[in-house]
Amino acid sequence: MQTGLTPVFAAPGAVSSLLFILVSLNACPFMKEPTFSICVYCGSRSGADPAFAALAAQTGRWIGQHGGQLVYGGGKNGLMGAVADATLQAGGRVIGVIPQALVEREHAHRGCTELHVVQTMHERKHLMAARASAFLALPGGIGTFEEFFETWTWRQLGYHAKPIGLLNHDGFYDGLLSFLRHSQAQGFMSPDLMALVDVDTHPAALLERLARGADGEFSPLAAVF
């Protein structure tokens, strides 16, 4: 059973301001305020192993069952759809943010508690970051990598102090972590930079830490990106 309310599509400009208000008025009377809000980056494909979709669903269930809110890219395909569906089914709120150009390609999820349609990828990422209190990267492709690295860079530069997690399911990110250590050994990354990302293979343990530490503020200065 879905708990998502009727979505409101928000376009940029003056109209979007009104629509954002309507979303808020629609949602508040029926749902409790979330105790934390985790932005999940993940693939719009399901991947070769069914375990990836199961992992995304497990992540969404945990968020919903613990009174949280999912912020994500607004699509219904792949891991994105799996994490959103599971959050909704577990009673959680889901905030989807998707560019107009991807509404058809990524099949915008009309069951979201809030579904914001924006013009650009920059607007998408900034709104997702602003609505989140923590970030988590699941397995995915270059879009997932780009979002993860940008969020990490923003943290390094001091634009936010929100926790960042990397779920290294079944060694999916082993190669990436090895390369990052290589970059550090070659002097391109400071030793404390890796400490800004919480890496774990167990979703529940990682999610608990992210939810518990989700109290950092996202600086408006990040809008310059």
Put a short name on every predicted segment.
Residues L88, W154-K162, F188-S190:
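Arginine/glycine-rich "motif VI" loop of SF2 helicases in the C-terminal RecA-like domain
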Residues G13, M31-P34, G158:
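Short, flexible hinge/linker loops that cap or flank conserved catalytic cores
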Residues V8-V15, V23, A27:
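Acidic, Ala/Val/Gly-enriched low-complexity intrinsically disordered segments
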Residues L138, Y159-K162, D170-G175:
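Glycine-rich phosphate/nucleotide-binding loop
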Residues F30-R131, H169-A204, E208-R209, D215-F225:
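A cross-family phosphate/adenosyl-ligand binding-site feature
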Residues E123-G158, G165, E217-A222:
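Active-site/ligand-binding-proximal alpha/beta "capping" segment
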